[in-house]
Structure formats: C-alpha cells, structure tokens
Amino acid sequence: MQDGRQLNYQTARFLTSAPGLAQCPPDQGAEVAFAGRSNAGKSSAINTLTQQKALARTSKTPGRTQLINFFTLANDETYRLVDLPGYGFAKVPDQVKLEWQRHLSEYLYERATLRGLMLVMDVRHPLSEFDQMMLGWADEKAMPVHILLTKADKLKPGAAKSALLAVRRQLADWEDLVSVQLFSALKRQGVDEARARMDAWLLHQAQ
C-alpha cells in the first residue's frame, strides 16, 4: 500500500458485463479479479467486502452465467473489481466448459491491468480441480493470488485453523506467489485482511 492510503470498497458500483476479452473495458488502470467454484461463496465475499447486499448476484443455475462483471470504485474507472464466472463442473456441458476456459484464460493471460487474483474456496472443500487449474494459470503468469477460505464460521475455530494450515502446507512451493486467509461473510471475519491485500495490489500498481 502506498502512503497508508486505503480504497473505499463501499463505493463499488456496477460498470459493465463482458462475454469475453474483446468486450472488456479499456485495459487501463488496475483490477483485482475474484474467481471460485459456483458454491464457494464468491458473490457473498464480494458483497461483504463492499458492504453491499446485492452488488454481485448469485446465479440460480451454477456455472451457467458466463459473463465477466466489472465494478468501479469511487466512480473512478482507474480501480476495478472483476467478478469472473462461477464454475459448476457437474451442470456445465462440455462445450460451455471449453468456452469458459478459453475466455477465462484469455482474460488472465492478456489483461495487462490485472494485478492480483482473489481465489475463493470453501474452507471445507479447498483445492478442487478448478482451484488447481486457476493456480496453474496464475503461476504461468507469475500472478499473485490471495486465497479466501470462506464459510469459516461453519467450522469450530480449531478446525478452521487446521484447515488453513493444511492449505498453506500444500501450497508451500508457491509461498512467494500465494497467500491464504480464513474468511466468513456471515461473521465478517477476515474483511480487513482481504481489503488490505486488495489495497496493496491496486494502489501500488496504479501509480
């Protein structure tokens, strides 16, 4: 973070939706993207971090919404949050899955303003096939990743801490690229830590 500054995430407002890279807003400024399985609590995490109940909307059909959603901060398009499509393996036809992978990989590889990836995982079911695919893509681009282990309130504190340590051990080889924290939208646990990570990415890189 530069000079102790902080962004006001409560000012987040919807900007636009894009089906693919070509329809995204101009590649200027700085972005932080959120990715996660359809049932990992990604929308709840975004809404909690911005203190808005319905900024990010949850699809009733997991994996069907294929749009990339952009949000601006403080009516300034310099800083953006990006909600990447949720991924529901079981209910997605192969053709849709391939298209999703193509659009997402294009965004991750070619979007110059992408400064970091917030990867949302259910603390009870971390490091799924999807999560590992995302980490692999991030590793290839040397993209920093901050993992939110969501729904931490579903576990007792000791079990949640054990899950956190287990994920950190599994990702020890990537410790320079990946950081991990517990998060609960219901209890607002981990909000300050997650915001500080986004501030560091957005404010440092947008100078």
From Swiss-Prot:
Any GO CC annotation of this UniProt entry: cytosol
PROSITE patterns: G_ENGB
CDD domains, per the entry: YihA_EngB (cd01876)
Record: residues binding GTP: 36-43, 63-67, 83-86, 150-153, 182-185
Keywords: Cell cycle, Cell division, GTP-binding, Magnesium, Metal-binding, Nucleotide-binding, Septation
Domain EngB-type G, residue spans: 28-204
One function term, GO molecular function aspect: GTP binding
Cofactor: Mg(2+)
Cross-referenced InterPro entries: G_ENGB_dom, GTP-bd, GTP-bd_ribosome_bio_YsxC, P-loop_NTPase
Pfam families attached to this UniProt entry: MMR_HSR1 (PF01926)
GO aspect biological process, one term: division septum assembly
Binding site for Mg(2+): S43, T65
Role, per record: Necessary for normal cell division and for the maintenance of normal septation.
Family per similarity comment: Belongs to the TRAFAC class TrmE-Era-EngA-EngB-Septin-like GTPase superfamily. EngB GTPase family.
Name recorded for this polypeptide: Probable GTP-binding protein EngB
